[in-house]
Swiss-Prot record:
GO cellular component: cytoplasm
Catalytic-site annotation from UniProt: 8 (proton acceptor), 129 (proton donor)
Flavoprotein among keywords: no
CDD domains, per the entry: HisA (cd04732)
Enzyme class: isomerase
Family under the similarity heading: Belongs to the HisA/HisF family.
Subcellular location: Cytoplasm
NCBIfam families the record matches: 1-(5-phosphoribosyl)-5-[(5-phosphoribosylamino)methylideneamino]imidazole-4-carboxamide isomerase
Keywords from the UniProt entry: Amino-acid biosynthesis, Cytoplasm, Histidine biosynthesis, Isomerase
Lineage: Bacteria, Pseudomonadati, Pseudomonadota, Alphaproteobacteria, Caulobacterales
Entry superkingdom: Bacteria
Name of the molecule in the record: 1-(5-phosphoribosyl)-5-[(5-phosphoribosylamino)methylideneamino] imidazole-4-carboxamide isomerase
Species of origin: Caulobacter vibrioides (strain ATCC 19089 / CIP 103742 / CB 15)
EC number: 5.3.1.16
Gene: hisA
Catalytic activity, reaction form: 1-(5-phospho-beta-D-ribosyl)-5-[(5-phospho-beta-D-ribosylamino)methylideneamino]imidazole-4-carboxamide = 5-[(5-phospho-1-deoxy-D-ribulos-1-ylimino)methylamino]-1-(5-phospho-beta-D-ribosyl)imidazole-4-carboxamide
Length: 241
């Protein structure tokens, strides 16, 4: 299982939100590039970056901060937040992003996502952000009428690298990962699934790995790393077991 430490960008700073609420942002580092380097030193092999302002505005906003991250580290980066055009995808891949995450556009224009996956094989992920059983859009400010499985099945055989499923009710709350919800999606599709939201302790990683059924491909670690409820070394050992 691959672990993805998360850097969420708001106004150029590294923050964590509670349940995706932009008004409940805690600044953990004013230098995202410095934070990225720390995660590399901790031994992580990937980095998960989200442009929070971009997710709400529908276009990349924290461009300078992302570029500084890309310049400061050599491990691969997956980036999401406000990327809703093929031109936007291309620009970030040319800038050095290894995997682009598409969320809102996956709901509104699935054909664009499929075309992106054809143009950039294994470099497109789909964000499946779930609240009250439905997929959220526009930086989690709106709800679609699609379930996680409904959305994900649109992209079977499309060449999408991963599905990133986030339980919004648990995001930033350190309440434990929704193993059942993650597992249900993983068993329903053939696309690798990455769990996000609520991973609070090494035990959550162990629970994801121990479940019966399709293997969970990865997990995103956010507040747990910043708050110290998970030690990177212990998390990486658990993920590799």
């Amino acid at each position: 299982m691959i672990l993805y430490p998360a850097i969420d960008l708001k106004d150029g700073q590294c923050v964590r939100l509670l349940h995706g609420d932009m008004d409940k942002a805690t600044v953990f580092n004013t230098s995202p590039a410095d934070q990225a380097q720390r995660f590399v030193q901790d031994g992580f092999s990937w980095l998960h970056v989200v442009d929070l302002n971009g997710a709400i505005e529908g276009k990349s906003v924290n461009t300078a901060a992302v570029e500084q991250i890309l310049e400061s580290i050599s491990i691969p980066v997956q980036l999401g937040g406000g990327i809703r055009t093929l031109e936007g995808v291309e620009a970030w891949i040319e800038a050095g992003v290894s995997r682009v995450i598409l969320g809102t556009v996956a709901v509104h224009d699935p054909e664009l996502v499929k075309k992106a996956a054809r143009l950039w094989p294994e470099q497109i992920a789909v964000a499946v952000d779930v609240r009250d059983g439905k997929v959220a859009v526009d930086g989690w400010t709106g709800l679609s009428d699609l379930s996680a499985i409904d959305l994900s099945r649109r992209f079977e055989d499309a060449g999408v690298a991963a599905l990133i499923i986030t339980d919004i009710s648990r995001d930033g709350a350190l309440t434990g990962v929704n193993v059942e919800g993650v597992g249900e999606l993983a068993d329903a599709v053939s696309i690798p699934v990455i769990a996000s939201g609520g991973v609070a302790a090494v035990a959550d990683i162990e629970r994801l790995k121990a479940r019966q059924g399709v293997e969970i491909a990865g997990a995103i670690l956010g507040r747990s790393l910043y708050a110290g409820t998970i030690k990177p070394s212990e998390a990486l050992i658990a993920a590799a077991a």
